[in-house]
Amino acid sequence: MKNVTLGDYIISFDNTLTKEFCEGVCEKMKNDTRRSIGIVGRDKTLNLEIKNSYDLHISPLADWREEDGIFFTTLASFKDKYMDTLQENTGLTPDFFANTGYGYASNGDVFADTGYQIKMYEPGQRYNWHHDYIIDAKEGPRVLTYIWYLNDDFEGGETEFIDGTVIKPERGKMLFFPSTWMYVHRGKLVTKGNKYIATGWFYHQHPLTNSMFEDK
């Protein structure tokens, strides 16, 4: 097996969304008064020392249905590309990933995508050092994070990982990385202009866990 680093699991793809689509989402988010100050953690608390952004979960909203559908089809395609690239980077086989919760469901397991959040950062806002791992009571543990960068006409706002990896926001770029505690990262301070991203997670739903929440 080759020598594998944490950085091998941090993978991005360029131009996954069109310029027109990205611009439309940014403009729509800018004008949507339902956005709210972002919350953090399983307890969904407000902590501006950690996270300072405006968030909107678009998937339940009827007037965002078209955008939600485009995010869904794009995610479905590039999640598979992520797994293919990950195998190339690590030399590991699909059989390995089938037993570790990274994208290949087996034995009744389900990997749930729970929808998309649009985030807007104004100058002076950021998301400080954190990791994305939580265990949701119904959805299970998060296993994979994805981010779309919707614009790049701002300054600052890079995604930085604790190992020194830095991702420069570029319109249409999509980033994947594991949601575990080992992938501590931050969205750096935006210093000029507004930054827009869309983000979400895959959750690993074990069949035993799912059965606990079935209607009796």
What is each model feature region?
Residues M1-M174, M182-K216:
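Fe(II)/2-oxoglutarate oxygenase catalytic core
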